[in-house]
Design a protein with these regions (language model features):
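Membrane-interface helix-loop-helix modules in multi-pass membrane proteins
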Residues: 1-37, 170-182, 189-233, 247-266
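Transmembrane helix-loop junctions in multi-pass membrane proteins
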Residues: 5, 67-79, 103-109, 223, ...
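Helix-loop-helix module between adjacent transmembrane segments
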Residues: 9-103, 174-182, 264-272
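Hydrophobic, small-residue-rich membrane helices and short re-entrant helix-turn-helix hairpins
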Residues: 37-46, 107-116, 182-215, 237-241, ...
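Loop-to-transmembrane helix boundary motifs in multi-pass membrane proteins
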Residues: 48-55, 66, 282-326
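Hydrophobic alpha-helical segments and their helix-loop junctions in multi-pass secondary transporters
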Residues: 69, 73, 77, 81-94, ...
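Central hydrophobic cores of alpha-helical transmembrane segments
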Residues: 364-376
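Terminal cytosolic tails of multi-pass membrane transporters
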Residues: 367, 387-439
């Protein structure tokens, strides 16, 4: 619908967000595992801010991630409908059930393998589609570089970096939100960084991810931009265009592989999310309410069984939400207006809590910052004329302001920093000089 701006606000913004994180944030995540033995992203918050703040962030984050995962089910339902003609609701249910079985049995390792294999298949298919569309353009005397003039005649502004609601201000504010999300505010990404060997390896992973975000979307988006010229009369381009490109330019036997890869890509994201939700619930939320549960998770077999039950329950909930995605404004609204706006509210204390600079921000201030962030989010939804540029970033800005100002007030009042929290922050201050504990 909007053209080149999609690459700017999605690919370029996220690339910059991850580059910033590679320098500032991600090196601290493996240190938490090496030095303090944490496994879930919110586990360290108990030492840093106390259990009430940890629970507030963990429970809030679980609710948000359920919306994000549901949006992914809805998205794959739309794709399956475009490829096969099955109803969208059936695609959501089938995707959810297959993924539930897969992640329950295979865990995070199965997710990593799926991610790698689906990328290889998608890379091959993406190249085939790009070459096929490029050939079709050349038959019209055009190329990917020269097609923009004709595209702009069909829809003025199609080649603009900022188009419609996606203004320069919107992109700058979105960068602010994505910097927190893609460097640990989104828990499944924090889990990936936690699982790297050390701070240096975490940074390398971030740089590789940023590079792929810069290059890979061009291979996917360029044929779809060009397809506005090749297939100008589609009734519903959002659901018809990519399946039509695949069926037109990819050899018949490979179409099934592309569909499988798209399915696996969605499954790779969702199972990673659900795996992390299960870890947070099992290690950080449930033990706070039950001494019996705390003792149960110390037993490996029992712990695994509990994790699988939690995984199944969460998957069912997200399928139900995915079936009702239109109630939230559709897939894009779920991803941007709901999850994208709220993830920073829990991401601010999760990431800024890693830095000694903010050591005077305590648990009470942290809970207050999260509450204020969610109130700001509610305000953006309740006010009918709230500026679209500020919708995503406002909750995060409010949360960050309360978090930082509250810490400054504590410092001015001379309130002490907890000894265990201060020791944690001192260790994190130099992530490359950590003595690695033997597992």
């Amino acid at each position: 619908k909007r053209g080149f701006t999609m690459y700017v606000w999605l690919a370029l913004v996220i690339t910059l967000a991850i580059v910033i994180g590679a320098k500032v944030f991600v090196g601290k995540w493996p240190v938490l595992r090496q030095r303090f033995g944490i496994q879930s992203p919110t586990e360290y918050l108990k030492t840093r801010f106390g259990q009430p703040a940890q629970l507030t962030i963990a429970i809030s984050g679980v609710i948000m991630k359920l919306l994000d995962i549901a949006a992914k089910w809805a998205a794959i339902g739309i794709l399956l409908h475009g490829f096969t003609g099955i109803p969208v609701w059936a695609g959501v249910v089938v995707s959810g059930l297959v993924s539930m079985i897969y992640i329950t049995i295979g865990g995070l390792w199965a997710d990593l393998v799926t991610d790698f294999v689906q990328f290889i298949v998608q890379l091959g298919a993406g190249i085939v589609i790009a070459v096929g569309v490029g050939t079709a353009l050349s038959e019209r005397g055009l190329s990917y570089l020269t097609m923009w003039g004709e595209l702009n005649t069909i829809q003025p502004g199609f080649s603009n970096p900022f188009n419609g609601d996606y203004t320069m201000l919107w992109c700058v504010l979105y960068l602010f939100a994505k910097t927190f999300e893609y460097n640990g505010g989104n828990w499944n990404l924090a889990a990936r960084f936690i699982s790297t060997a050390n701070a240096s390896e975490a940074r390398k992973a971030a740089v590789l991810s940023a590079t792929m975000y810069l290059l890979w979307p061009l291979l996917i988006f360029a044929p779809m931009w060009a397809a506005r010229l090749l297939f100008p009369n589609l009734a519903d381009p959002a659901s018809e265009l990519y399946p039509l490109l695949t069926q037109t330019y990819v050899p018949t036997g490979m179409v099934g592989l592309v569909l499988a890869a798209m399915f696996a890509a969605t499954m790779g994201m969702t199972v990673s999310d659900i795996n992390t939700l299960s870890a947070v619930t099992q290690r950080d939320i449930a033990p706070a309410f039950s001494a019996r549960f705390r003792s149960m998770i110390e037993q490996p077999r029992t712990s695994l069984r509990i994790a699988r039950v939690i995984t199944v329950c969460f998957t069912v909930i997200t399928i139900v939400i995915g079936l009702n995605a239109n109630s939230f404004g559709g897939v894009l609204s779920l991803v941007i207006s709901w999850f994208g706006a709220m993830v920073g509210v829990t991401g601010v204390p999760l990431l800024l809590g890693l830095f000694r600079t903010f050591r005077h921000t305590d648990g009470r201030v942290t809970i207050g910052s999260v509450v204020c962030g969610f109130l700001a989010f509610a305000l953006t939804k309740l006010l009918p004329d709230f500026p679209s540029d500020w919708e995503v970033a406002t909750p995060l800005i409010v949360c960050a302001a309360v978090f930082i100002l509250g810490g400054l007030v504590n410092r001015a009042l001379g309130r002490d920093v907890r000894t265990d929290a201060d020791a944690l922050l001192t260790t994190l201050a130099e992530p490359d000089r950590v003595d690695v504990l033997t597992p």
